[in-house]
């Protein structure tokens, strides 16, 4: 069983949902970023969703765009990110690690080289934000060759054929987008048809469903679980904590610890 499969089986046995934080690697710098990861895991993160700094992130709102810029301004590249992942994997052999990134970062070294590197450093799953499920075959084949699970986004406007294709191809987890638009902790609305989407995904035997976009409060985690999701992903709210505490790492890690423990507590019934 993959790490994600094992995680969801264990959580189901405990009647818990998953809380998965997202951060951009090497923001604000390599050492602080690793301490951020340690803090997330120590305070209850069930898995990690990690971004690589990129100059033109498509789905990211201003908060995560700023995180990308901080890491890029510090001179951190894909090489540094893979070095960080290897360090995380060495310290935490069981934690599931997913990447959320843009296709350019996969294409530039070639898909084969990228997914080989993912496998060598301990990545479990990759979600390429700007590759729709209809155009995904070559990516899924390249990922599968190296034992990497391919994750796909289910948008709020997905029709039945798209839902069935997502359910067939996605592995590890399904990323259910709360609403159209870009990531933001401020915009906490979600589409009115999420319950129907979740039902359709489950009927199609989809991988476990994690709801993301705008998840910033424990009540939203509980709501996602009530709707039938298997957990929730929070990114902008976490990156915002980093952004407002750049002058005090102690305060940054303390606030992060509190936030993650409260969000994780909301996954327990």
UniProtKB/Swiss-Prot annotation:
Which family does the record claim for this protein?
Belongs to the TrpA family.
Q: Tell me the InterPro entries matching this sequence.
A: Aldolase_TIM, RibuloseP-bd_barrel, Trp_synthase_alpha_AS, Trp_synthase_suA
Q: Which reaction does it catalyse?
A: (1S,2R)-1-C-(indol-3-yl)glycerol 3-phosphate + L-serine = D-glyceraldehyde 3-phosphate + L-tryptophan + H2O
Report the active site residues.
49, 60
Q: Which residues form the signal peptide?
A: none
> Which keywords describe this protein according to UniProt?
Amino-acid biosynthesis, Aromatic amino acid biosynthesis, Lyase, Tryptophan biosynthesis
Phylogenetic classification of the source organism: Bacteria, Pseudomonadati, Pseudomonadota, Gammaproteobacteria, Pasteurellales
Question: PROSITE patterns, per this entry?
Answer: TRP_SYNTHASE_ALPHA (PS00167)
**Name of the protein described by the UniProt record:** Tryptophan synthase alpha chain
Subunit field text: Tetramer of two alpha and two beta chains.
Write down the superkingdom of origin: Bacteria
Please describe what this protein does.
Answer: The alpha subunit is responsible for the aldol cleavage of indoleglycerol phosphate to indole and glyceraldehyde 3-phosphate.
What HAMAP family does this protein's entry cite?
Trp_synth_alpha
One GO cellular component term, please give it: cytosol
Q: Which organism is it from?
A: Actinobacillus pleuropneumoniae serotype 5b (strain L20)
Q: Please state the Enzyme Commission number of this protein.
A: 4.2.1.20
Pathway note: Amino-acid biosynthesis; L-tryptophan biosynthesis; L-tryptophan from chorismate: step 5/5
GO molecular function ontology, one term from the record: tryptophan synthase activity
